[in-house]
Regions:
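Short loop/turn segments that connect beta-strands within beta-propeller blades
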Residues: 51-54, 107-110, 161-165, 206-210
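Residue position within the beta-strands of beta-propeller blades
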Residues: 41, 91-93, 146-148, 188-189
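Repeated scaffold domains used in trafficking and secretory/extracellular systems
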Residues: 26-32, 67-84, 129-138, 173-182, ...
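Structural motif
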Residues: 46-48, 99-105, 152-158, 195-203
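Hydrophobic core
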Residues: 9-13, 17
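Surface-exposed loop and turn segments in beta-propeller and other repeat-based domains
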Residues: 60-73, 115-129, 217-220
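Short coil/turn segments that connect the beta-strands within blades of beta-propeller domains
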Residues: 36-37, 87-89, 141-142, 183-184, ...
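Beta-strand-rich domains and repeat architectures in extracellular enzymes and scaffolds
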Residues: 22-45
Length: 231
């Protein structure tokens, strides 16, 4: 009875629109604003779309997404990411699995038709059998940049070519946030584990060579989930 009363009180304190969204779309791992006020979301390996009226609809089922992935691919739905698409693509869906494989699916047209545009095992810089997690990703033209961490506290940031399917290791620093800039560089948040003696900082990362230059320090002993750039 106490649990039921707590749940009812919680729902009363949540604004109606937020409460409806929370009930309709549980466990959202990624959100992407789209044209006409629409919103795409990934939830439990499904792609959902909310229209301008606030109504949610299923766009792609888990079965459809799994069918578009390579054989024996085990998608890590909790770390799936949506990115804006180009050249007619409505959006890009990045699906990692814990072994270090990644698939990139293109969602095209009003029905979000699925096309696999990248799939590969990334050449991880560790000889140990690790469990990998996708931390951040960004797109610049036909190149995707994806930052991973492992359960052995190792890190890998890769450049993935959507044009020819190639990939290469860009950096082994703990990148928590990536944003492409117009001059061929990436704005990155280098955020080591809290136990590390290295300080967190913003840095500029060359998108071709991976060479970095430190911009400014961030408050220590903090973990950052995301940033926004204004100006």
């Amino acid at each position: 009875m106490k649990k039921l009363l707590c749940l009812l009180l919680t729902l009363l304190l949540i604004p109606p629109a937020l409460a409806e969204d929370a009930l309709d779309v549980p466990d959202v791992s990624s959100l992407l604003p789209c044209a006409n006020g629409a919103l795409l979301a990934v939830s439990d390996l499904r792609v959902l779309r909310r229209d301008s009226a606030g109504d949610w609809a299923l766009v792609l089922s888990a079965e459809q997404i799994s069918a578009a992935c390579p054989p024996r691919f085990m998608p890590d739905a909790a770390n799936a990411l949506l990115l804006p698409g180009e050249n007619g693509a409505y959006a890009l869906l990045l699906l990692p699995d814990t072994s270090g494989q990644i698939a990139v699916l293109s969602l095209t047209g009003a029905t979000c038709e699925l096309t696999r545009v990248f799939a590969d095992f990334l050449p991880m810089n560790s000889e140990m059998t690790a469990q990998w997690t996708l931390l951040s990703a960004a797109r610049a033209g036909n190149t995707l940049y994806a930052a991973f961490s492992s359960n052995f506290a190792t890190y890998s940031t890769y450049a993935l070519s959507l044009a020819d399917g190639s990939s290469f290791l860009l950096s082994d620093a703990p990148m928590r946030f990536l944003m492409p800039l117009a001059d061929g560089q990436l704005l990155a948040c280098v955020n080591p584990p809290i136990s590390s003696i290295d300080e967190s900082c913003f840095a500029l990362l060359d998108a071709d060579s991976g060479e970095s230059s430190r911009l400014c320090a961030l408050p220590t002993h903090k973990a950052y989930a995301g940033f926004a750039l204004d100006g």
